[in-house]
């Protein structure tokens, strides 16, 4: 059985308790934060387990890399404190079961791009940026064979992840992949953060999509024409699992001549899209989600953004229309990069 690599001593010796003190959705002081995280570690009930909006951010805030969010999720499940309504959890668990037979395994013998469960977004990986890069999980009927499972962190179901993920890794490995460019942050976070945290072996090297895009743009540097757009980036929950890769957002903007507007809710202080808050269906959750979304979009607008750049399809689905309704054009990062090299992005709308 895979066990979380959590060290209680790190929490005891921590000087900041930043994992909870910095939380934007729970108001807590340092002393209370220390008490509550230790209660959680000991398997005791805590208001944190009940008030958590599952935004992943404490994984980034923790200065000790002690996996506070993974710990919270495991204890929510152990104490039967579901962050979402039980019918939604069960429906989500059932949705992730692979169906329609086994996928066709094509030998790649090198680098490939993994679409995961976003086979219907193949239009976002077209053009010269992706020339010559084999793609795994292109068939929507078979995409759940490549589903990274990490969505179930939002459901407090670590057991499902640990049960299903080894089979997913085995299926990917059968393609003889050495480097795996992950279309979605969540897939990258799975293989680069979650798997090591529970001692699950990954037989390939995960590569963040933004790192890939940046390096590919460097190769095509002579073709880049500055986009001259003022942009705001909607940072997704899953980006919190790979904070070391977040730097590529600004690096890409600098390379393609996009101006990142100065915002309050940016980088470590970013707000989530509010989708999971609304999905919690608790008293006041809809108003809370609406408030988060309002503050987020007003911040973009007040900063003068022309474009809101997305990486996560769930964030796009949740905020895209709201952003557009505020006069800001929503666009995926890959499409913005295509625009910079003179291509017409299929997803630009």
Language-model features and meaning:
Residues 108-110, 176-178, 203, 224-230, ...:
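A general structural motif
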Residues 11-19, 23, 52-58, 62, ...:
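Short cysteine clusters
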Residues 21-36, 61-78, 278-292, 317-328:
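Iron-sulfur (Fe-S) cluster-binding segments and ferredoxin-like electron-carrier domains
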Residues 119-124, 238-256:
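Active-site glycine- and acidic-residue-rich loops that bind
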Residues 128, 135-202, 240, 247-251, ...:
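Cofactor-cradling patches in redox/metallo enzymes
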């Amino acid at each position: 059985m895979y066990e979380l690599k959590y060290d209680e001593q790190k929490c005891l010796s921590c000087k900041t308790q930043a994992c909870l003190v910095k939380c934007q959705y729970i108001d807590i002081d340092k002393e209370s934060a220390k008490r509550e995280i230790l209660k959680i570690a000991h398997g005791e009930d805590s208001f944190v387990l009940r008030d958590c909006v599952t935004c992943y951010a404490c994984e980034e805030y923790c200065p000790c890399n002690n996996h506070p969010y993974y710990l919270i999720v495991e204890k929510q499940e152990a104490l039967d404190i579901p962050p979402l309504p039980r019918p939604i959890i069960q429906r989500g668990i059932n949705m992730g079961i692979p169906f329609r037979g086994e996928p066709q395994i094509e030998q790649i013998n090198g680098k490939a791009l993994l679409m995961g469960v976003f086979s219907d977004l193949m239009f976002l990986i077209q053009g010269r940026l992706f020339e010559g890069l084999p793609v795994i999980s292109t068939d929507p009927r078979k995409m759940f064979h490549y589903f990274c499972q990490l969505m179930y962190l939002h459901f407090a179901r670590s057991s499902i992840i640990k049960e299903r993920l080894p089979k997913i890794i085995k299926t990917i490995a059968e393609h003889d992949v050495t480097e795996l460019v992950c279309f979605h942050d969540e897939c990258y976070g799975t293989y680069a953060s979650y798997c090591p945290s529970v001692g699950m072996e990954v037989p390939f090297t995960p590569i963040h999509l933004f790192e890939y895009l940046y390096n590919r743009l460097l190769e095509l540097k002579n073709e880049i024409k500055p986009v001259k757009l003022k942009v705001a980036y909607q940072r997704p929950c899953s980006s919190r699992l790979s904070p070391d890769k977040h730097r590529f957002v600004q690096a890409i903007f600098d390379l393609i001549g996009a101006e990142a507007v100065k915002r309050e809710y940016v980088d470590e202080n970013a707000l989530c899209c509010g989708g999971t808050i609304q999905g919690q269906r608790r008293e006041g959750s809809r108003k809370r989600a609406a408030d988060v979304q309002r503050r987020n979009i007003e911040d973009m607008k007040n900063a003068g953004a022309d474009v809101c750049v997305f990486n996560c399809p769930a964030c796009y689905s949740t905020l895209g229309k709201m952003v557009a309704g505020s006069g800001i054009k929503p666009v995926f990062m890959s499409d913005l990069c295509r625009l910079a090299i003179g291509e017409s992005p299929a997803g630009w709308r």
